[in-house]
């Protein structure tokens, strides 16, 4: 079962069904408004490929693609918006599905290995601790050797289990999550 949320789905007179994904960026370029690396970051992109896969599951061959509805957020430029059209061949979506299943299997294998390890937990990727504004768990890693051995909450952190099936109320549809 694949769970997610599409920002918007439209029926276009010329293009049929189009999935709209709203995005904002501060990646500014004087010449065009949007930096070229931002424009190209959507292809390939696992999130977008997943939405397109879901779109084809829901609407079949009526889906013509995804349009990234990009808005530039900048201190002096307030009028830069752009649609970035994205499409994939079915073979590319098949590869996305294979790779996604591979990542799921890797995570399950890592969890099994972590459960058996005397050190507990997953292996850390310490080269990424400061990327994207920094990891939210950096302080725990700095001061606690084996977080998995601790039952109590860490100061400043809240334990919250993400349960999308509860949010979607699948029991009302008489569906159950896959085991």
Language-model regions, residue ranges each:
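Non-catalytic protein-protein interaction segments used by genome-maintenance enzymes to assemble
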Residues: 1-48
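Metal-dependent nuclease catalytic regions and adjoining charged, substrate-binding loops involved
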Residues: 32, 40-43, 50-179
